[in-house]
């Protein structure tokens, strides 16, 4: 197993944020993952509302429409509150910033390696 990579970056160093966003590509798989993560977080935050609606609708078919309407609306309002585009944008921003940090660390590492003297034979 490989060891976890040690960061060569000072935790206070925020120069990596100077890397333009255009150098970081958000792959479709990451976008999909972040959307799923947002959905999972929202369901966790609204678990009491989701459970209440699920309990109400257990033994009902068509009557669920009018018998569980209030619980469904509470669940929907909660999910809408937590599943916002602002939260998704924030998650994407965190991912982009983490990518910038990795890019910056790689550049620093290359600079350090290029400055090291080569051993003479």
From Swiss-Prot:
It comes from the Eukaryota. It comes from Dictyostelium discoideum. The keyword Transmembrane does not apply. Residues 43-86 form the CHCH domain. This is Uncharacterized protein DDB_G0275933. A motif (Cx9C motif 2) lies at residues 68-78. Pfam families: Cmc1. Disulfide bonds join 46-78, 56-68. Keywords: Disulfide bond. Belongs to the CMC family. GO terms for cellular component: mitochondrion. A motif (Cx9C motif 1) lies at residues 46-56.
């Amino acid at each position: 197993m490989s060891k976890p990579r040690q960061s060569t970056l000072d935790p206070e160093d925020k120069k990596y944020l100077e890397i333009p966003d255009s150098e970081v590509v958000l792959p479709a798989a990451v976008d999909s993952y972040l959307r799923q993560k947002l959905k999972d977080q929202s369901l966790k935050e609204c678990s009491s509302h989701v459970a209440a609606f699920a309990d109400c609708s257990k033994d009902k078919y068509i009557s669920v429409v009018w018998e569980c309407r209030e619980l469904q609306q509470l669940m929907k309002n909660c999910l809408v509150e937590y599943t916002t585009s602002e939260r998704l944008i924030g998650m994407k921003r965190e991912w982009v910033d983490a990518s910038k940090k990795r890019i910056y660390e790689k550049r620093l590492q290359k600079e350090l390696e290029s400055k090291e003297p080569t051993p003479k034979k």
